[in-house]
Each structure stands twice: as structure tokens, then as C-alpha cells.
Amino acid sequence: MDLQSRLEALIAPSLDAMGYELVRVQLQGKQRLTLQIMADRKDGVMMAVDDCADISRSVSALLDVEDPISAAYTLEVSSPGIDRPLTRAKDFVAWAGFEAKMESCQPIDGRKRFRGKLLGLDEAGVNVRLVIEAAGEIAIPLADVRGAKLVLTDELIAATLKDQEE
């Protein structure tokens, strides 16, 4: 198991017990490492600074005990934000209908980067469906998605604000 997978396996249960969901873990940098943890509240309420501080204290204590990273690092905790990364299969379903940018590991019709309206997953849950203006609908195998994130649009902002009012 690689370090990122080990970190996810270590951190996710702790966040779950606190009422949060792990969105992404990234360890970046060469000489100065930064461990970035992105989390969301399970109850759907927008993350606040206090939520990030609670997660930081809990994860910091956990990592001090388990010590999975041998070098010095900086811990950063954040919410996904409005133009959030799409990292889990359920993200592609939950955010269907909104504009997204995606990058695939393998070229599809000679391209690796795409931008279009997210349609969600196919019935088998294997392919991410996206409508590109010039090319029509395409399907990218979920396993081949290198990166994906929502595009900040007026529609996305309005939907996010509406969700917070409810």
C-alpha cells in the first residue's frame, strides 16, 4: 500500500467518527512536505474554520502517534470549496448537471483534457459521462480519471447558496 493510501486509511475513520467525510489527501513537495487534507461535513452544512481546526487537532494527534511520514511536514486542512475536486464516484453523481474539467490518463479521441457538462456515471458506475460542446457526449472510465473538478460558474454558486439556505 502506498503512503497516500495508508494516510487515507488512517485518517478516514477518525474523520468519520467526528461527523466528517474525507474528500482528498495529498502529500506534496520535495524538500518541504505539505500534507493536505480536504474534508466535508456529513450533514451537508458548509465547513467553517472551527471544523478545520477540530480536524487538524484530531489528525495531528493521530499522526503523531502513528508516525506514517518519516520527514517533517506541514499539515493543512481545508474544505473542498465551491469549485471542489471530484475524487469519489459519488461526487460525479452528486454534481451531475454542473460544468466540470477533467483529465484522463489515456487519450480519448486524441485528447486528455476535457471541459463540459457533467452527466454523472453510466448505469454500471464505470464511466464518467460528460457533454462537450463541440464533441457531444463522451465517456471516460472512472479508473482513468487523473483529475476532475467543478468549474466555478454562476449556476454552481447559486445552487451552493440555495443548498446552504435549506
UniProtKB/Swiss-Prot annotation:
Gene Ontology cellular component list: cytosol
User: Which CDD domains does this UniProt record tie to the protein?
Assistant: YlxS_C
Under the heading SUPFAM superfamilies, the entry gives: YhbC-like, C-terminal domain, YhbC-like, N-terminal domain
According to the record, the signal peptide region is none
What NCBIfam families does this protein map onto? PRK00092.2-5
Give the function comment from the record.
Required for maturation of 30S ribosomal subunits.
This chain belongs to the protein called Ribosome maturation factor RimP
The gene name reads rimP
